[in-house]
Structure formats: structure tokens, C-alpha cells
Amino acid sequence: MSLTNKNVVFVAGLGGIGLDTSRELVKRDLKNLVILDRIDNPAAIAELKAVNPKVTVTFYPYDVTVPVAETTKLLKTIFAQIKTIDVLINGAGILDDHQIERTIAVNYTGLVNTTTAILDFWDKRKGGPGGIICNIGSVTGFNAIYQVPVYSGSKAAVVNFTSSLAKLAPITGVTAYTVNPGITKTTLVHKFNSWLDVEPRVAEKLLEHPTQTSQQCAENFVKAIELNKNGAIWKLDLGTLEPITWTKHWDSGI
């Protein structure tokens, strides 16, 4: 899929991986890049505009933990402004297993709520045009970092939820896939807390393993968006992009 003249809404598009991905996106000659983030960063927005002045870059403050109704209201404003949204990227995430409720609220519930809100506009059963959802998971959604089971569990939930969305595409008209970064050099992994402090040195130990830069991750992130494969589970690790084949152990039969 060519991203030229597309309208993309990026939740958490100013974070570590997010900002580098936003830089790559504007190079693709989007029509609009709408960034929803909790904290404004005028310098980063100005930089993105300078990378490609042809792209309209807009920022709206957004906390993914707000009720669905508030998200729907914000999306209504965005649709009124740019008329169509082609791609939604759900990228909000925290890594701190001391904050159990907030980890689940940001990493999973917020993603589900944002998705639910945009279906109000996209669902073909309501006369919507359909759309594309790219959800950011993590390799911990495949195999946990067991010292951070809350974070890992939230990312496993993202993979499962997104796979369900993909299978619902014939009904809703909305396709979906996950991008799942491996250990990436961002502030997220420099210092974080393990669950019940089972491993106080978890961040230090994790960074002893091979990593990738946020730029490497961003480049593959945008490649995955351009490939636009419904139901794909992409692994973005060590500077590579690889599709994951999920093993089926059970089928509901419905």
C-alpha cells in the first residue's frame, strides 16, 4: 500500500519508537499525520513539519485511559477537520509492573477503547468506509519477560485482540495487524520495575542482550504498514522484519 496522500492518526506518535516512526511516515508524502499524545512536544511537531512541509502535521492532546465517549468526541473533531482517516496506529505503552492497573489501562484497555471508538466511524454496518488498524504489541506478547508478567500479559492481550479484529474484517470492513518490537533502545527500557521487585536489576540485565535502535525499528514499522497484511503478526527485532505464524492449539468452531 502506498502511503502517499493517506491520512494517518498515530496514538503516541511522539514517543521513543513513535517519533522515529512519525519521521519515516512524513517522508512517505502523507496528506495528514494526526498525532495524539499525552504530552505536547512543539519542537518535535515542528521538526516533523520541516522533514516534509507537504504533509500537514497536527497534534491533539490525548490520554488513552479516558472513557470511550471522550475518544469518540475527539475523533469526531478529527474527522470534521480532515474528512477521512485511512490508518489508525495504536502505540501507547508503559513498562512498569509496579503500576498494575495503569499498565493494563494504557497498554490494553486504552487500545481497545480507541479501536472501539473509531469503529463508530469506520464500521461498514453503519455505512462506514472501513479502515486499517496497526496495533503496537511486543515480542513479550509471544514469550513473556517473566519478571514483568503484567506488561507481558498486556501485550499478549493486544496480539489476541488484534487477531480477532482481523478475522472480523469481513463484517466490519476494518483490517488489523500487530507490529511487535523486540528490545529497542528507548527510555522505556532504560529503567523499569519488575513485578513485586522479583528482579531489581531487570532493566540492566535486559540491556545486556542484543538490541536494535528505534530508527531500525521505525523503518521496519513503516514497511509493515506499507505491506498492509490483514491479520499479520510482525516481529521487529534486531533490525529485521519477520512475519510470525501463530500456532493453533484450539478452535472455537464458530
UniProtKB/Swiss-Prot annotation:
EC number: 1.1.1.1
Catalytic activities: a primary alcohol + NAD(+) = an aldehyde + NADH + H(+); a secondary alcohol + NAD(+) = a ketone + NADH + H(+)
Subunit-structure text: Homodimer.
GO BP field: alcohol metabolic process
Name of the protein in question: Alcohol dehydrogenase
CDD domains: ADH_SDR_c_like (cd05323)
Gene name of the record: Adh
Binding site for NAD(+): 10-33
